Amino acid sequence: YPDDASETPDTLQTVYDYDMWLGPAPKRPFNPNRFHFNFRWFWDYAGGLMTDWGVHEIDIALYAMGVSAPKSVMASGGKFAYPDDASETPDTLQTVYEYDGFNMLWEHATGIDGGNYGTTEGIAFIGNNATLVVNRGGWKVIPETENVDGQRVPKVEEVPHTRPSGPSALDLHAVNFVESVMANDPSQLKCAIQTGSVAAINAQMGNIAYKTGKKVYWDATKNLFTDIEANQLIKANYHNGWKLPVV
């Protein structure tokens, strides 16, 4: 994943509506390094790879396992790959989510294109008989083996990388979203709004655990952490006259 956030001086800009782009983020001089694409690496606007890619991966795991919120989260990482650049978010991070009956481990390393299981990104469901590796580009099954008469024999049949057939899933989702908006009918959505919201919330929890440096615990009845410092990071501080509407 690209990460070219070298130090860049502030400049004047006349092309963009910069104030509107900033929105509720703190007012500061325009700097091209904090604009598109690199805004992802600055806390004022985003949450680094934990949230940028977390919502594209975590939703698959949460949907498959039928869960929404973890019992606890802890994270460790830092700026290890690019310690001297201007970015603020961790380029390297491991986050452990504890759910009932299983843990989910998130791991990212900016600048390293090769990943586990021969893929650049994805979710691995690790079971007793095999590992299912899946992302938006397809899936594969890697079997565990067992000793049978001195030979290592696969417990289940291996499934090589298989791509989904038919039209692009991204195109189908985009069309479905637009049609649902035009009909003003969220029930038409193939991927419900809640699916996206819980993925975003879990991703933000990872960053909150990283910022506190603690293992934080979630109270599902109150929709709050049990830690005061963690709760202070749930809501952003709005600037420039922007306010979060109260519903």
Predicted segments, located by residue:
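Contiguous beta-strand/loop segments that form the cofactor/metal-binding neighborhood of enzyme cores
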Residues: Y1-V247
